[in-house]
């Protein structure tokens, strides 16, 4: 009996749970529970099925477990073969057996008290673990029900805000690109207009150079004509002098002829001849003078007209040149203003691009940070779920241990409450090992609990018990 209780004492829930299950010999009253654990589904699997099998073995007697156990325990006392079944023992042997039985009962009471104390401590620890398990289950449920939803809502809200800002920035960038394209078109058009104005300026400069050549030629012609006029005036003056000298000479000759005529009154035809000659010379001189004056006047009028025409052309060329200069200056100012505007717009566009790039990088960093936080929260949830599953496994093992201890206590209480028979009326019989083996049998209860999980959540549970008699 003490050996049976010592073996049952070795079957401790604390040792089985935390110190490993001891090995029991064949035929012990209690075999350790078997907890085969199926591995959890790895990350990414849609569902997993976890099965746990609990094996509880209980030894019961054929006619009565206690009687068989007591008979097998007391059967070790060698009884002489001369005594038959049903014969009484002598009182000395009965006293010895009674004393041994009382000692065994006292030891059993002490051991049972120790086991009760240990069992009370074990119950307290189980209650504490159940409280922790309930707190962790509540925490897991809270995390399942609230925290992921709130984080998802915050993430979705920030993601929508970031998408809206990205759309606004994209629209602004598209608008800036359109404005830039329009400005580039205006710049190209102004460049084409500038090229046309430059070509017109070059043509005006070429015309001005041609006009300058014409003016120079007209100036040279005018100077030449002025020199010719001077030479003609000098020639006219010289001819006048020559004519006057000829006239004086002719007058002197006429006077001499008149003197001779007066001296020679006998020659009246000479005076008439001189008069005719003088008239002829005067006619010729007047004709030459009139022709020279007409030629001079015609030349002067031609030169004056040419000079006036050249002066008009020069004045018109100067006016056109001034207009072209004013246009070039206005176009140059306009081009400078457009260049400044283009530079400012390009600078603004670069600043906007840099700002958009920095904001986009900031948004990307925020998105990466939020994704990292979500991943961290998911890892925390998975860790809490694993801890919860482990605690659930421990709880189920403890439940099985408690049930086992309850069965043991019920068996001990039923054994203690049995009436103690008078040893004088006890009939002892010797049983052989073959008979004890036929009387003792083992009843094994197999509990199969199937838990189906999907993505870390318990979907369904199923419990099945199988009883086998060994």
Swiss-Prot record:
Protein name in the entry: Desmin
Record bears the keyword Magnesium: no
Source organism: Bos taurus
List of residues that carry Omega-N-methylarginine: 16, 37, 70
Assembly and interaction partners: Homomer. Interacts with DST. Interacts with MTM1. Interacts with EPPK1; interaction is dependent of higher-order structure of intermediate filament. Interacts with CRYAB. Interacts with NEB (via nebulin repeats 160-164). Interacts (via rod region) with NEBL (via nebulin repeats 1-5). Interacts with ASB2; the interaction targets DES for proteasomal degradation. Interacts with PKP1. Interacts with FLII.
Taxonomic lineage: Eukaryota, Metazoa, Chordata, Craniata, Vertebrata
Molecular function GO terms recorded: cytoskeletal protein binding; identical protein binding; structural constituent of cytoskeleton
Residues with ADP-ribosylarginine modification: 58
Site positions (Stutter): 354
């Amino acid at each position: 009996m003490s050996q049976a209780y010592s073996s049952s004492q070795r079957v401790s829930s604390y040792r089985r749970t935390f110190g490993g299950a001891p090995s029991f010999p064949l035929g012990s009253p209690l075999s350790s529970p078997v907890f085969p654990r199926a591995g959890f589904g790895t990350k990414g699997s849609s569902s997993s099925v976890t099965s746990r099998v609990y094996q509880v073995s209980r030894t019961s007697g054929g006619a009565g477990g206690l009687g068989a156990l007591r008979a097998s325990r007391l059967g070790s006392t060698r009884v002489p073969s001369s005594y038959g079944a049903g014969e009484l023992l002598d009182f000395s042997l009965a006293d010895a057996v009674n004393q041994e039985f009382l000692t065994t009962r006292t030891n059993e009471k002490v051991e049972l008290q120790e086991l009760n104390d240990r069992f009370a401590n074990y119950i307290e620890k189980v209650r504490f673990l159940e409280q922790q398990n309930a707190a962790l289950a509540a925490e897991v449920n809270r995390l399942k029900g609230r925290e992921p939803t709130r984080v998802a809502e915050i993430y979705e809200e920030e993601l929508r805000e970031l998408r809206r800002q990205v759309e606004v920035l994209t629209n602004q960038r598209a608008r800036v690109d359109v404005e830039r394209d329009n400005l580039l078109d205006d710049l190209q058009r102004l460049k084409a207009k500038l090229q046309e104005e430059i070509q017109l300026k070059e043509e005006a400069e070429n015309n001005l150079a041609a006009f300058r050549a014409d003016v120079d030629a007209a100036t040279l012609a005018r100077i030449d004509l002025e020199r010719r006029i001077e030479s003609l005036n000098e020639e006219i003056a010289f001819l006048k002098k020559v004519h006057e000298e000829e006239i004086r000479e002719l007058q002197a000759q006429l006077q001499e002829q008149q003197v001779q005529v007066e001296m020679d009154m006998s020659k009246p035809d000479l005076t008439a001849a001189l008069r005719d000659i003088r008239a002829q010379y005067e006619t010729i001189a007047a004709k030459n003078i009139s022709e020279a004056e007409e030629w001079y006047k015609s030349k002067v009028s031609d030169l004056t007209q040419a000079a006036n025409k050249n002066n008009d052309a020069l004045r018109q060329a100067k006016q056109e040149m001034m207009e072209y200069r004013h246009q070039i200056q206005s176009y140059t100012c306009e081009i400078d203003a457009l260049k400044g505007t283009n530079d400012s717009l390009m600078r603004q566009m670069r600043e906007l691009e840099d700002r958009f790039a920095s904001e986009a990088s900031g948004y990307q960093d925020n998105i990466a940070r939020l994704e990292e936080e979500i991943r961290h929260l998911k890892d925390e949830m998975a860790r809490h779920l694993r801890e919860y599953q482990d605690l659930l496994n421990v709880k189920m093992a403890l439940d099985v241990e408690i049930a086992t201890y309850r069965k043991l206590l019920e068996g001990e209480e039923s054994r203690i409450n049995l009436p103690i028979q008078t040893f004088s009326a006890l009939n002892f019989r010797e049983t052989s090992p073959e008979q004890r083996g036929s009387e003792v049998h083992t009843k094994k209860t197999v509990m199969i609990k199937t838990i189906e999980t999907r993505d870390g959540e318990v979907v369904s549970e199923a419990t099945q018990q199988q009883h086998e008699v060994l």
